């Protein structure tokens, strides 16, 4: 199956046409998008932002999976295992601002299966540990995003907060804060943070811990099902 998937991906890659892109200094400088298309933009490029012109029915997550060659180095995953992906957020160049996404589409986090949600929580915790130990980020707001938009997948963010104390989330203008960071001033720091965090997660062997947790959770779930079936059989 793996070989078939690899062959299929190669065929898909060969059929794909190169995408056009537009570079601008400010996001509001992007011209109107062509009919039937949408912009998938990242910070970086020859100016501050680069937008690829992609089919309107593709989500950002699907774009990054299907067109990995267009994902900038600073937005490559720092952790990826069994459907959960951690990377620097591609829209705002805030060092230490990480997004936790999924390779399957869910509209809301309560629709996740229990095992995936518990793994999500564990990976969030371990990533935050790395941010504290390796990046000196003591506090971060944990945010979730759910939309009815069919091309938006549920995800979580860790938004770093400067200083030794964190402002109350209700008093915190997240968009204003994130928009204050300029790509040309932050790219080197983002790359450094990514390197440090990726090395930390590799050093603690998070993939192994993640897989062990998954096996335990599945084992517990199967044990519960078996007990229920036995109890019903004895009635």
Positions of predicted regions on the chain:
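Histidine-centered divalent-metal-coordination microenvironment in nucleic-acid enzymes
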Residues: 97, 143, 147-174, 235
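Short secondary-structure junctions
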Residues: 81-82, 131-139
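A short linear hydrophobic-aromatic micro-motif
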Residues: 85-87, 139-143
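Active-site microenvironments that recognize anionic phosphate/pyrophosphate groups
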Residues: 2-106, 200-235
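A short, terminal or domain-edge coil/loop segment
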Residues: 139-141, 184-209
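Long, well-ordered alpha-helical scaffolding segments within enzyme catalytic domains
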Residues: 112-134, 185-198
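Helical (often loop-to-helix) elements that flank the catalytic cores of nucleotide-handling enzymes
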Residues: 165-185, 190, 194
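Short histidine-centered catalytic/ligand-binding loop motif
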Residues: 98-123, 175-186
């Amino acid at each position: 199956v793996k070989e078939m998937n690899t062959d299929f991906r190669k065929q898909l890659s060969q059929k794909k046409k190169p995408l056009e892109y537009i570079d601008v200094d400010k996001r509001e400088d992007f011209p109107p998008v062509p009919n039937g298309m949408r912009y998938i933009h990242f910070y970086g490029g020859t100016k501050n932002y680069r937008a690829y012109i992609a089919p309107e029915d593709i989500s950002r997550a699907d774009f990054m999976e299907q067109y990995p060659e267009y994902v900038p180095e600073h937005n490559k995953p720092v952790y990826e295992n069994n459907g959960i992906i951690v990377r620097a957020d591609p829209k705002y160049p805030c060092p230490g601002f990480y997004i936790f996404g999924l390779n399957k589409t869910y509209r809301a986090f309560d629709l996740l299966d229990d095992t995936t949600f518990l793994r999500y929580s564990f990976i969030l915790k371990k990533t935050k540990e790395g941010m504290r130990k390796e990046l000196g980020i003591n506090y971060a707001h944990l945010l979730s995003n759910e939309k009815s938009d069919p091309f938006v997948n549920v995800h979580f963010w860790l938004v770093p907060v400067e200083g030794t104390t964190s402002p109350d989330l209700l008093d915190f203008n997240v968009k204003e804060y994130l928009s204050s960071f300029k790509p040309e001033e932050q790219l080197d720091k983002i790359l450094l943070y990514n390197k440090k965090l990726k090395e930390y997660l590799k050093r603690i062997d998070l993939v192994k811990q993640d897989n062990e947790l998954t096996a335990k959770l599945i084992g517990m779930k199967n044990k519960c099902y078996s007990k229920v079936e036995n109890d019903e059989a004895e009635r």
